[in-house]
Amino acid sequence: MNIPSDRLYTDTHEWVNVSGDVATVGITEHAQRELSDIVYIELPKVGERFNQKAVVGVVESVKAASDLYAPVSGEILAVNTQLVEQPSLINSNPYGEGWIFKMKMTNPDELSSLKDAEAYQELLQDKE
């Protein structure tokens, strides 16, 4: 399974790619596999503010619906509007074209509570 080492990960299977004070967020390959074919996504609105671990949206698949959580506190700067018409991009390219939103972090210290790729791999192995 692909777990890029240039990102951080949450226990709820979101990934975070940090550039300065901007965090790009998506769901992991593991999460999209568990959900199966993604058919709909409810995106947050640009300008909305969320605290860490708050529900920011929903990902729906043919199997289930799953909440999407803010990995850090911040304000939504951009959402991937391509996902409205093509939610399957999350399945085909979860770490690239399937990114979900970008947020300006208001408390970058919260990044220390996230997992690196190795710790996320261990989390997945513990669940098997």
UniProtKB/Swiss-Prot annotation:
Gene3D superfamilies: 2.40.50.100
Assigned GO CC terms: cytoplasm; glycine cleavage complex
Keyword Signal carried by entry: no
CDD domains given in the database record: GCS_H
Organismal lineage: Bacteria, Pseudomonadati, Verrucomicrobiota, Methylacidiphilae, Methylacidiphilales
UniProt name for this protein: Glycine cleavage system H protein
InterPro entries associated with the record: 2-oxoA_DH_lipoyl-BS (IPR003016), Biotin_lipoyl (IPR000089), GCV_H (IPR002930), GCV_H/Fam206 (IPR033753), GCV_H_sub (IPR017453), Single_hybrid_motif (IPR011053)
Ranges for domain Lipoyl-binding: 22-104
Gene Ontology BP term (one): glycine decarboxylation via glycine cleavage system
Superkingdom, taxonomy of origin: Bacteria
Role according to the record: The glycine cleavage system catalyzes the degradation of glycine. The H protein shuttles the methylamine group of glycine from the P protein to the T protein.
